[in-house]
Structures are given as structure tokens and as C-alpha cells.
């Protein structure tokens, strides 16, 4: 190998992604009832709390709290033990009218003369490592977490017996990171390292109240999760890949699962989430350029969003 390249992804239950999805859902709701809505919606999520802020100009009425709770419930935050759940979290809105000074630069008499809401730099990027022209390290990172969410919802694997019922031990928050090795011709030659961290229930009960018993239970949980990632998740992901990518997996793969040892406390309770903090995950995983603008909660008059979509069909293959 000549060099290594790494990209990461985060799940739908990661705090920053929870915030992104709430902002996007509010945007969708405004546009559904008023396609000319101007929206810039930011969200903060933390222990038991959601804060909505931003600027909106629209003729639509949107039940902000209902939309936010719907998103949180769909993601899977529906248990009080998570310290952040759809039914009981408090929601505070500070959304207000869009600035007239900004609006005058956006809305024009002729639709084709519409202005941009701001300046900015936007980049498109493509490569031939995958069928969707995305970097392989990012594509695999996304796929790992997408499949992990499927497994969580199916609750037929990565489970334990709780009160006589088979239950998934997976919780919504997770992250992945994939490192690819390249040769001197910039071609991927092997999957070097996979790091996967997933939030989980406390599904092994310590033998007693001692520190040693708790540590033994933690080790047992970690070993179970590691085995399930290796024997359940990875085979399901690899089965979805084209043959040329499958051959990049070998017995030298370094697999790190929950490397801190335990991940029960997570989601917005474990780490405050904000809209727009995963811009590299949302684009090209560190390859290509990025102007710094986020996508979520913005209507198409915001060029951070619209010009990225315009650039997608015209990306040059590298």
C-alpha cells in the first residue's frame, strides 16, 4: 500500500443528525404547504430538550412541536431510559420572521431573477471507486450504519432476552469510520480498518454490586457486540457490495468495536447535537473541497444547498 484514507459516518440517531433531521422535516412541512417559503431552521438537542431557532417567511402554518416529536419517534428515541424521548422532551421555539434586508435580495418580481440568500463557495466531487461515484471509505461508512439501523428495527439479531421478550440491544446512536489502503495509482487495494461504535442497552446484569462484577459485565457486553458486528453486520454489508469491492476485505482487516469499552449513555443525553455539524459526512467524506456551508433546514434560495444539487450532475469523474 502507498497510503491510507479515512472517512466517517454517523447514524440517524447521532445527536447532530437528530438536529439535522428535525430542521429538514420543518423545512419540508413549510414547503409542502407553501412552495415559496423561505426557511433557515436550526435545531439544538440535548438532555430532554429541543430548541428550534431560525428565520422563516411563509404563508404556511406548521405545528413545529408535532413535527419535531414525529421525527424523534421515527428515529427511535421512544424510551424514557434514553433521557431524551419523543413523548416527554421539552420543545422551545425561537423561530421568527426572515429579515426584510435578506428577503429583498432574494425575492424578485421575475422568478428567473431570484437572488441568492448569501455568498458562498460550493464544490462538487465524484470518483469511480463506487457505482454512485462517492469515495469508497464514505460509502462503506454509510452502508454500515444504514444496515445497523435495519438490524435494530428488525430486532431479530443483536438481541437479548428482557422480561421474557426478545429485544434489540441496539440504541439509535452510532458512528462508523472506514480506512482504505491505496496503491501508487490511487486505486483502492484493501479495506484496512473499520471502527464501529454503537450505543446499546445495559443488557448484562452484574453478578453483584462490586466494581469487579460491573467490569466483568461490561466486558461480556463488549465481546457480544464485537462478535455480532463481525458475524452479523459485516456479512450483511459485504453481501450488498459489488464483487470488486468484496475482494478488498481480507483476514488482515482491523475491526474496532466500541473502543471506549461501553456506550450506554448516548444520543442527545450523552452529547448535545446541533444542525450543520456533519458537513463532511453529508458530502464527500473529506475528499474534494468544502466551502463550509451546511444543508439542513434551508430552502433552495440558500446556495449552500441549491448549488450543491446543481453541481451533482456535472461532477467530473476522477
Give, region by region, the residue ranges found by the protein language model.
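Conserved phosphate/anionic-ligand binding catalytic regions in large, soluble enzymes, centered on
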Residues: 10, 14-19, 115-130, 264-288, ...
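Active-site-surrounding "flap" and adjacent substrate/cofactor-binding loops of secreted or lumenal enzymes
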Residues: 58-72
Amino acid at each position: 500500500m502507498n497510503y491510507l484514507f479515512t472517512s466517517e459516518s454517523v447514524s440517524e440517531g447521532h445527536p447532530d443528525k437528530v438536529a439535522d433531521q428535525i430542521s429538514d422535516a420543518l423545512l419540508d412541512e413549510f414547503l409542502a404547504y407553501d412552495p415559496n417559503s423561505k426557511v433557515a431552521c436550526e435545531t439544538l438537542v440535548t438532555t430532554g430538550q429541543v430548541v428550534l431557532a431560525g428565520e422563516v417567511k411563509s404563508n404556511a402554518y406548521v405545528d413545529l412541536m408535532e413535527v419535531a416529536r414525529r421525527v424523534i419517534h421515527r428515529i427511535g428515541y421512544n424510551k424514557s431510559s434514553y433521557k431524551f424521548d419523543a413523548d416527554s422532551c421539552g420543545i422551545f421555539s425561537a423561530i421568527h420572521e426572515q429579515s426584510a434586508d435578506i428577503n429583498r435580495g432574494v425575492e424578485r418580481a421575475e422568478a428567473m431573477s431570484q437572488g441568492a440568500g448569501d455568498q458562498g463557495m460550493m464544490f462538487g466531487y465524484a470518483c469511480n471507486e463506487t457505482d454512485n461515484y462517492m469515495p469508497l471509505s464514505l460509502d462503506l461508512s454509510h452502508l454500515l450504519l444504514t444496515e445497523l439501523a435495519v438490524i435494530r428495527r428488525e430486532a431479530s439479531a443483536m438481541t437479548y432476552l428482557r422480561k421474557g421478550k426478545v429485544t434489540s440491544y441496539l440504541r439509535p446512536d452510532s458512528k462508523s469510520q472506514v480506512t482504505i489502503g491505496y496503491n501508487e495509482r490511487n486505486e483502492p487495494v484493501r479495506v484496512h480498518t473499520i471502527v464501529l461504535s454503537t450505543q446499546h442497552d445495559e443488557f448484562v446484569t452484574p453478578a453483584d454490586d462490586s466494581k469487579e462484577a460491573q467490569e466483568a459485565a461490561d466486558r461480556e457486553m463488549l465481546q457480544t457486540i464485537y462478535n455480532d458486528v463481525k458475524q452479523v453486520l459485516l456479512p450483511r454489508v459485504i453481501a450488498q457490495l459489488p464483487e470488486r469491492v468484496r475482494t478488498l476485505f481480507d483476514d488482515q482487516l482491523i475491526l474496532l468495536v466500541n473502543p471506549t469499552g461501553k456506550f450506554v449513555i448516548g444520543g442527545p443525553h450523552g452529547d448535545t447535537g446541533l444542525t450543520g455539524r456533519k458537513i463532511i459526512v453529508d458530502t464527500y467524506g473529506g475528499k474534494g473541497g468544502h466551502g463550509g456551508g451546511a444543508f439542513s433546514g434551508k430552502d433552495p434560495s440558500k446556495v449552500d444547498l441549491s448549488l450543491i444539487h446543481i453541481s451533482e450532475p456535472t461532477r467530473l469523474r476522477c
